């Protein structure tokens, strides 16, 4: 359908946004303190939170970038997902995380669409958020995290 200005119009009923916003970008690092020195000291991104997330096998730090965050991830061991990522690919972009208000609905929508999930049910993330990951094959080659913040 074309609008009055001749541009293509998409019917809003066809677009049901699953994600509210980009929550953070995750970066795998071998040395969290060294990475913090770069991101805080050089890039000027203040660290706002740091914690060990045993369930995911990482020590993580969140840095403010406007309304979003960068999440630095140091593996707690070589056999963790981030440890395996570092061994295979080295330090760098690990995932993109999108925020939702209802993670169960988002996961159901992914299942209904036939997307390959890493997590069928949410698990605990940083700051007691609820998180689940989509396999990169389901999202254009990018590891995708769905995040429902703790309330």
Q: What is each stretch, according to the model?
A:
Residues 17, 21-23, 45-57, 77-94, ...:
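A cross-kingdom feature marking solvent-exposed beta-strand/loop segments within repeated
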């Amino acid at each position: 359908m074309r609008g009055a200005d001749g541009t293509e119009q998409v019917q809003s009923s066809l677009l049901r946004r699953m994600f509210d916003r980009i929550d953070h970008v995750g970066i795998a690092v071998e040395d969290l303190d060294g990475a913090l020195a770069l991101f805080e000291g050089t890039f000027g991104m203040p660290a706002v939170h740091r914690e060990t997330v045993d369930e995911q096998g990482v020590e993580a730090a969140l840095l403010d970038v406007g309304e979003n965050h960068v999440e630095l991830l140091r593996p707690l061991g070589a056999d963790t997902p981030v440890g395996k990522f570092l061994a295979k690919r080295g330090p760098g972009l690990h995932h993109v995380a999108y925020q939702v208000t209802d993670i169960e609905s988002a996961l159901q929508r992914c299942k209904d669409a036939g997307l390959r999930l890493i997590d069928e049910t949410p698990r605990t993330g940083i700051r007691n958020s609820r998180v689940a990951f989509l396999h990169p094959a389901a999202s254009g080659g990018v590891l995708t995290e769905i995040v429902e913040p703790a309330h």
